[in-house]
């Protein structure tokens, strides 16, 4: 009887130890970057960046401190360069170990947006100021070169109807400048520039030409700097920029007008377990100081 009792007690102790061992996994430390250490991604980080001249890149490196003492862009030379929002999304969606950044309004389910410093990348958080990675959408033009049609289109963009489209498409609209009261217009407008602004402008174009069917609007996706140059040289009536214009660009005779606010979403592949990242970690990755996923913690 005593032997049987000892056997039962021994089994109970072993069972308790087994449960204790299993239970310890639930107490594994979670990294600052928001993922369990036992499931974190490992290996080389594939850094994906936009091209020089991209307004999204210019705003991103400025906001994240990826610049030197003279404000020069110091994105790591090992970064893979993409030349548009759509290519950035496709590249990140196809590379499990990649990280990139895109316009919040262009975000798709093909990639995962990370929280930055604990704040989710949403239009509401950009508007509230809790999501800090944000920038303006601007148009630019030479005021004295605008036709009546150009002026009418700009008035539509800034109207209640135009700003409703901005909000409906997931961007942050501005205070409208009244209702659109334009008359039937005819002619052609050429817009050129940011690949981040162009999806929004495409929606505005559709609504405007539905009211003004005799108007043709051509949208050229060429990047912010190229769009600003096109507006300066007269190759386009209106330039589109996802960054603020520089002093030298304004001194060339351009007028800049903000049409919306947009966040910049930091994105990874959907297979990446990471959910949260800090500004310092982003800076480390994009300057080349941090090269391994296991060091993002």
Locate predicted features.
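Exported/periplasmic ABC-transporter solute-binding proteins
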Residues: 4-6, 23-297
């Amino acid at each position: 009887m005593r032997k049987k009792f000892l056997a039962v007690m021994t089994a109970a102790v072993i069972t308790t130890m087994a449960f204790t061992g299993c239970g310890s996994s639930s107490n594994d430390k979670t990294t600052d970057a928001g993922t369990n250490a036992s499931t974190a991604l490992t290996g080389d980080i594939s850094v994906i960046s936009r091209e020089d001249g991209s307004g999204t890149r210019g705003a991103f490196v400025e906001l994240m401190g990826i610049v030197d003492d003279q404000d020069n862009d110091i994105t790591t030379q090992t970064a893979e360069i993409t030349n548009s929002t759509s290519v950035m999304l496709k590249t990140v969606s196809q590379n499990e170990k990649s990280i990139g950044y895109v316009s919040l309004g262009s975000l798709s389910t093909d990639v995962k947006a990370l929280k930055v410093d604990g704040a989710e990348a949403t239009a509401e958080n950009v508007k509230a100021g809790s999501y800090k990675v944000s920038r303006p959408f601007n148009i630019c033009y030479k005021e004295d070169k605008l036709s009546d049609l150009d002026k009418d289109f700009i008035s539509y963009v800034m109207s209640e109807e135009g700003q409703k489209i901005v909000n409906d498409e997931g961007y942050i609209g501005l205070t409208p400048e009244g209702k659109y009261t334009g008359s039937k217009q005819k002619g052609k407008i050429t817009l050129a520039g940011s690949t981040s602004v162009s999806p929004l402008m495409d929606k505005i174009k559709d609504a405007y030409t539905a009211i003004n069917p005799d108007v043709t609007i051509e949208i050229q996706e060429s990047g912010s700097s190229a769009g600003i140059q096109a507006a300066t040289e007269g190759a386009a009536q209106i330039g589109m920029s996802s960054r603020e214009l520089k002093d030298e660009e304004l001194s060339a005779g351009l007028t800049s007008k903000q049409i919306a606010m947009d966040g910049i979403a930091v994105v990874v592949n959907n297979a990446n377990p990471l959910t949260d990242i800090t500004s310092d970690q982003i800076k480390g990755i994009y300057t080349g100081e941090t090269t391994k996923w296991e060091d993002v913690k």
